[in-house]
């Protein structure tokens, strides 16, 4: 696991965009996340597409999750969200952006089919991730199995409450079930790119990076991955104990060693 500490989340977004640009230029498969954390990175990639000609035409992409029962046309579906925030602004073909089907007649079966589709398409080359304040990744809440596959999960009441801000503050409008890639599925991506910003993420970052690998902190599974990059701003890194080494390692990184 490589830890990159940046002064601000804008600096982090630029580094993340540098990493993703390499994959885009090679036509690789991207794993996309929604939420506020990757927005700066998406905006920087959109800028490079518009101003520098960065193309995503040869790429394909998979999203992490979707609400169960929410039509994809709904503005808060993750199908709509990823297009509104990123993919509709670049040249990746829409038919090459794959999403879980939250309105499938048989959601459990659809989850298994999505898991198989990822494998059939060659797997994910780089997966963007964010971390919840409780250490969750995607919708894998604490105590999720580290071997879990794409499946249906019941949202924690706190998650429903948090997400109600996207539904005019009305918790009754927030779906209580989601289809999410499992931790085992996510682990199969060849490169995990974790972005963490803000002091409210400091405890989760500490648990993920320097705590034990445990189901109570799903993100701690990154410690077992052969190629994980964690980019944090100063606020999110505030509780890490080994920042001196993380900074030293980055400053002395050989030119030939990519992120």
Curated annotation (Swiss-Prot):
What does the record list as GO biological process?
Answer: carbohydrate metabolic process; glucosamine catabolic process; N-acetylglucosamine catabolic process; N-acetylneuraminate catabolic process
What are its E.C. numbers? Answer: 3.5.99.6
Which GO molecular function, any one, fits this protein according to its record? identical protein binding
Indicate yes or no for the key word Cell membrane. Answer: no
Please state the pathway this protein functions in, per its UniProt record: Amino-sugar metabolism; N-acetylneuraminate degradation; D-fructose 6-phosphate from N-acetylneuraminate: step 5/5
Q: Where are the transmembrane segments?
A: none
Instruction: Name the active site residues.
Output: 65, 134, 136, 141
Q: Which GO terms describe its cellular component?
A: cytoplasm
Keyword list, A-Z: Carbohydrate metabolism, Hydrolase
Give the enzyme's main class according to its UniProt record, as a single word: hydrolase
Q: Which domain of life is it from?
A: Bacteria
Catalysed reactions, as listed in the record: alpha-D-glucosamine 6-phosphate + H2O = beta-D-fructose 6-phosphate + NH4(+)
Q: Does the keyword Iron apply?
A: no
Gene3D superfamilies noted in UniProt: 3.40.50.1360
Q: Name one Pfam family in it.
A: Glucosamine_iso
Q: What does this protein do?
A: Catalyzes the reversible isomerization-deamination of glucosamine 6-phosphate (GlcN6P) to form fructose 6-phosphate (Fru6P) and ammonium ion.
Q: Give the UniProt family note.
A: Belongs to the glucosamine/galactosamine-6-phosphate isomerase family. NagB subfamily.
Name this polypeptide is given:
Glucosamine-6-phosphate deaminase
Q: Which organism is it from?
A: Corynebacterium diphtheriae (strain ATCC 700971 / NCTC 13129 / Biotype gravis)
């Amino acid at each position: 696991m490589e830890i990159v500490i940046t002064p601000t989340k804008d600096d982090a977004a630029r580094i993340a965009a540098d990493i993703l640009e390499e994959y885009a230029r090679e036509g690789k498969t991207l794993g996309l996340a929604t939420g506020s954390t990757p927005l700066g990175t998406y905006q920087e990639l959109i800028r490079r597409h518009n101003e520098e000609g960065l193309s995503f035409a040869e790429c394909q992409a998979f999203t992490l999750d979707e609400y169960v029962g929410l039509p994809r046309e709904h503005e808060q579906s993750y199908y709509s969200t990823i297009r509104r925030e990123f993919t509709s602004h670049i040249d990746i073909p829409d038919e090459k952006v794959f999403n879980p089907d939250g309105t499938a007649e048989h959601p459990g079966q659809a989850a298994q089919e999505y898991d198989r589709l990822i494998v059939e398409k060659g797997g994910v080359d780089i997966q963007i991730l964010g971390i919840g304040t409780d250490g969750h990744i995607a919708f894998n809440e604490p105590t999720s199995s580290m071997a879990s596959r794409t499946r249906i999960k019941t949202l924690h009441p706190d998650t429903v409450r948090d997400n109600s801000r996207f539904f005019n503050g009305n918790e009754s409008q927030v779906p209580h079930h989601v289809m999410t890639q499992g931790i085992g599925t996510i682990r199969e991506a060849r490169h995990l790119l974790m972005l963490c910003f803000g002091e409210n993420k400091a405890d989760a970052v500490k648990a993920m990076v320097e705590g034990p690998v445990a189901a109570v902190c799903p993100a701690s599974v990154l410690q077992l991955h052969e190629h994980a990059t964690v980019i944090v701003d100063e606020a999110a890194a505030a509780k890490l104990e080994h920042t001196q080494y993380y900074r030293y390692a980055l400053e002395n990184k050989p030119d030939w060693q990519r992120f």
